[in-house]
Structure formats: structure tokens, C-alpha cells
């Protein structure tokens, strides 16, 4: 674990008017932090990027593009970008905070969704993607992990890191990107493709997953997977209605020229059932001049950055952070085992000393064949996925929520979501001796029940 990652558990930070809290997401090139606007009290998500990392990996153009695209797209079903700030060594992207977790977590818990529920999410997805395409924006990495749910259960499309903005005179895209199981066959062929048709294919795979609980194209080795995708070789389970089956087959047409378009999807009888058009305000005038300014090294334009260090013990989680971890303002959602679905950020409670908790996690992780990096009550566990095709990693952090009461937050940072849920259940079983569960459940103690262990 890098020095900054290790120090994160022992410090508090303020960026401009934002009080920066715990890490709530992590990718290859960025971390997402929970933050609070000190002026308004509003909770936000702060995406933090390191300038040197961006330059060393030649990601400058892609990051500029992502920021520009997120400023352009303003839709109720798309995660909103509020502002972008530049520090001496960091770039801070302030985003709408989405508290309902990933859509894929519902699938991981329930197996599949009812047809009416799947249709609602698909309708919202198509509305959002149709809007993006009207702005000349193609997402190119649509998958359930990039589809979030707000506190009211509405869909929010996120992660425009692989998106592209159409240029005049350029008809076909040529960069292969996205997650293999969701990628259209023409994208895999590297012969150029239409971004709109490719996004439609991915939407079809997502609809299938929502209704089936598993992927239409899934193999242990990539050549066989690519062959099935290219041939459009799949079948719908018996519980799909005729209307849904017909629409999915028209979407998962391996020929992009005969594949159904978004306009045709919106006219489909199955799609239109119970459809409620989204109400949008007028498009805002978007100024992209500040995007370039973020990357200019002009010191007097840097946002103020203040860091204070604690005594090296576990971070104390305040009530506001606990509330924002739950759905809406219901604190019981933080630990209630009867939740409708499990968030990717799962957690458990222990009355053991913090050092004992960390030591136990280290021992258990090693028995599970995982490499352990530990510092300042924060641990990163690394391994490989069960199919050996991708890395698997989780981050655990110990928080003090009350005297002699600690919460361990567990987060997936790499790997398949379904595999993560299996890992978490196995971890809880192996750590049974330190996980605390109240014997009697009262209105007060219900707040301290574990999430899924």
C-alpha cells in the first residue's frame, strides 16, 4: 500500500469549502471520497485524481474529456458534476452523492428482478443514453456496476471515463474499450463501429442480466466468449415474457446495421408499458473554459488544501457520515440485516480492540490466499478472481463509532461484484469470533446490527 493510502486513516482534510471524509470508491486512477460542503451542509462525492499519475500514464486527454462530457450531460438519470477544483498536485471533481448503491447489488442479492421492475430501470437507462446520444456523447462502458440507485430507487448512470464525444466528420469509433461481457461484437472486431449501436447492445445485455440474474454471454476463456458474442449465441430463459424476449433478440443482433435503434426501442410495445416520461428542465448553458484552467499550473488559482493528523488511532465516524452511509435518513439501514439489497460497501461491528480486529483480519486474509497490506487501521487485500482473468481487491477500514465499539467497513476496489459478495460472506464466517451481535433487538440496538454477516 502506498504511503498516501496508508496515511489516509490517520488524517483529516479540507479542500476549499469541503470537509473530506472516508474513501467510498476507488479505481485505477482515482479515489472517490465522501465530503461535506461546509457552507451548505450538503453531502457530495469528491473524485480525487493525482496530476503526476495522469501525466505518467498519458491520461490527460481522457480526463479532460471525461470532465467535459460530465459537464455537458445534465439529466435526472445521470450523476451530476457540480464543479471541478485544482490543487497543487490533485484534481478534485465534485459529484452528486448517490446513496442507494449499485444496481448490480440488487441482482447479487435477489438473483433477478421482476419484469416490471427491470423494465422501469431499462426505461430510465434508455432515457439517459438517448439524451447522451442527442448531445453526441457515447458511454462505451455500460454495465450494472456503472448504474447506481439514488435514495428513491431511481437509476443514475455513472463513470464516463471511457466515453467519447463525437467529432464532426468522424462516423466510426475505433478504440476497443468496455467490459468484454457487455461489449458489442463490432467493437471487438476493431474495424470501427457506431457508438450509438454499441451502447444499444450494452443496454440489451443489461436488460437480460436484470431479468435473468446472469449474463447472456459468459465463458471462462476470452476466445470462446468473443465467439459467442460475435455469433449472437444466447437464449432467453422461460420466464421472460414474449415481448421481452422479442425486444432482447432485436437488441442483441450481432449485425449493427439491422440492430434495433434507440428510437425503435422507445416505440416498442413492451418498452412503452407503464412508461412515464422523465421531466427535464431546460438545458443549461455549459462553459468548458474552466476545464482547461484546472490543468493549468497557475498557483493563485489553486484551491486551499489543509490536512490535520490524528493520534494514529482509528478514525472516529461522526453521526453525519453514518447517516449518509444509510439509505435516506434511516440509520437502521446502516446495519439492518433485512435490507432490500446489500450495498457494495458492506460492514460489520465488533467490540474487540481495534488492534485485535486488524490482526484477525490479517490472519483470516492469509488463510484465504490473499496478499495483505496494512497501515493505520486500514487494510488492502489482493488476489485474483476465480476465473483467473482479472485482479480482485478489497479495502477494509476500522472506524470508532462509540467508545469500545468499532465498525469495519469493507469495500470492493477491483473484481466482479458477485464474487465480492461470496468473498464477504466467507470473510464473515471466518471472523465470527470477533463480530458483535446484540442478544436483544430494541429500537436502539437495532442500529448496531450487522449489515449481512
Curated annotation (Swiss-Prot):
Q: Which GO terms describe its molecular function?
A: ATP binding; protein serine kinase activity; protein serine/threonine kinase activity
Q: Which domain of life is it from?
A: Eukaryota
Q: Where is the active site?
A: 141 (proton acceptor)
Q: What is its EC number?
A: 2.7.11.1
Annotated stretches, region: Activation loop: 159-186
| Chain residue ranges for the region called PPI | 343-372
A GO BP entry:
signal transduction
- Induction, per UniProt: By drought stress and abscisic acid (ABA).
Which SMART domains does the UniProt record give?
Answer: S_TKc
What's the catalysed reaction? L-seryl-[protein] + ATP = O-phospho-L-seryl-[protein] + ADP + H(+); L-threonyl-[protein] + ATP = O-phospho-L-threonyl-[protein] + ADP + H(+)
* Every Protein kinase domain range: 18-271
Asked whether the UniProt record includes Transferase among its keywords, one would answer: yes
Q: Name one Pfam family in it.
A: Pkinase
The record's keywords, sorted A to Z, are: ATP-binding, Kinase, Manganese, Nucleotide-binding, Serine/threonine-protein kinase, Transferase
Ligand binding (ATP): 24-32, 47
Query: Gene3D superfamilies this protein is in?
Result: Kinase associated domain 1, KA1, Phosphorylase Kinase, domain 1, Transferase(Phosphotransferase) domain 1
Output the CDD domains linked to this UniProt entry: CIPK_C (cd12195)
Q: Which cofactor does it need?
A: Mn(2+)
The record describes its quaternary structure and partners as: Interacts with CBL4.
Record's comment describing the protein's domains: The activation loop within the kinase domain is the target of phosphorylation/activation by upstream protein kinases. The PPI motif mediates the interaction with the ABI (abscisic acid-insensitive) phosphatases.
| Biological role | Involved in the regulatory pathway for the control of intracellular Na(+) and K(+) homeostasis and salt tolerance. Operates in synergy with CBL4 to activate the plasma membrane Na(+)/H(+) antiporter SOS1. CIPK serine-threonine protein kinases interact with CBL proteins. Binding of a CBL protein to the regulatory NAF domain of CIPK protein lead to the activation of the kinase in a calcium-dependent manner.
Q: Which family does it belong to?
A: Belongs to the protein kinase superfamily. CAMK Ser/Thr protein kinase family. SNF1 subfamily.
Q: What is this protein called?
A: CBL-interacting protein kinase 24
Originating gene: CIPK24
Amino acid at each position: 500500500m502506498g504511503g498516501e493510502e496508508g496515511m489516509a486513516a490517520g488524517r483529516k482534510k479540507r479542500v476549499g469549502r469541503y470537509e473530506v471524509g472516508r474513501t467510498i470508491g476507488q479505481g485505477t486512477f482515482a479515489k472517490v471520497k465522501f465530503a461535506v460542503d461546509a457552507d451548505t451542509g450538503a453531502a457530495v462525492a469528491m473524485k480525487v485524481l493525482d496530476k503526476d499519475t495522469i501525466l505518467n500514464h498519458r491520461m490527460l486527454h481522457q480526463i479532460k474529456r471525461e470532465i467535459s462530457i460530465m459537464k455537458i450531460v445534465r439529466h435526472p438519470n445521470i450523476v451530476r458534476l457540480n464543479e471541478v477544483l485544482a490543487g497543487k498536485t490533485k484534481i478534485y471533481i465534485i459529484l452528486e452523492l448517490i446513496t442507494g448503491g449499485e444496481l448490480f447489488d440488487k441482482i447479487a442479492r435477489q438473483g433477478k428482478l421482476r419484469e416490471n421492475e427491470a423494465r422501469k430501470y431499462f426505461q430510465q437507462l434508455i432515457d439517459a443514453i438517448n439524451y447522451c446520444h442527442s448531445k453526441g456523447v457515447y458511454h462505451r462502458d455500460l454495465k450494472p456496476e456503472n448504474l447506481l440507485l439514488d435514495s428513491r430507487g431511481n437509476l443514475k448512470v455513472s463513470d464516463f471515463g471511457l466515453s467519447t464525444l463525437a467529432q464532426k466528420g468522424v462516423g466510426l469509433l475505433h478504440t476497443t474499450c468496455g467490459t468484454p461481457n457487455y461489449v458489442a461484437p463490432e467493437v471487438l472486431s476493431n474495424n470501427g463501429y457506431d457508438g450509438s449501436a454499441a451502447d444499444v447492445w450494452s443496454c440489451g445485455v443489461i436488460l437480460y442480466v436484470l431479468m435473468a440474474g446472469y449474463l447472456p454471454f459468459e465463458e471462462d476463456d476470452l476466445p470462446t466468449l468473443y465467439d459467442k458474442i460475435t455469433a449472437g449465441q444466447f437464449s432467453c430463459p422461460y420466464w421472460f415474457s414474449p415481448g421481452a424476449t422479442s425486444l432482447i433478440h432485436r437488441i442483441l443482433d450481432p449485425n449493427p446495421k439491422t440492430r434495433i435503434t434507440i428510437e425503435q426501442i422507445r416505440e416498442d410495445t413492451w418498452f412503452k408499458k407503464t412508461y412515464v416520461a422523465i421531466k427535464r428542465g431546460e438545458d443549461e448553458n455549459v462553459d468548458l473554459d474552466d476545464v482547461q484552467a484546472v490543468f493549468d499550473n497557475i498557483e493563485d488559482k489553486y484551491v486551499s488544501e489543509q490536512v490535520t493528523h490524528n493520534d494514529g488511532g482509528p478514525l472516529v465516524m461522526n453521526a453525519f457520515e453514518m447517516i449518509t452511509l444509510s439509505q435516506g435518513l434511516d440509520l437502521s439501514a446502516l446495519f439492518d440485516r433485512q435490507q432490500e439489497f446489500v450495498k457494495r460497501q458492506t460492514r460489520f461491528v465488533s467490540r474487540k480492540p481495534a488492534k485485535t480486529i486488524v490482526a484477525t483480519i490479517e490472519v483470516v486474509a492469509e488463510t484465504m490466499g490473499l496478499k495483505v497490506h496494512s497501515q493505520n487501521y486500514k487494510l488492502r487485500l489482493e488476489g485474483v478472481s476465480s476465473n483467473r482473468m482479472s485482479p480482485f481487491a478489497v479495502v477494509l477500514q476500522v472506524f470508532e463509532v462509540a467508545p469500545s465499539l468499532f465498525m469495519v467497513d469493507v469495500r470492493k476496489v477491483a473484481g466482479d461484484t458477485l464474487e465480492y459478495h461470496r468473498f464477504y460472506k466467507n470473510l464473515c464466517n471466518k471472523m465470527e469470533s470477533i463480530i458483535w451481535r446484540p442478544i436483544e433487538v430494541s429500537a436502539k440496538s437495532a442500529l448496531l446490527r450487522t449489515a449481512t454477516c
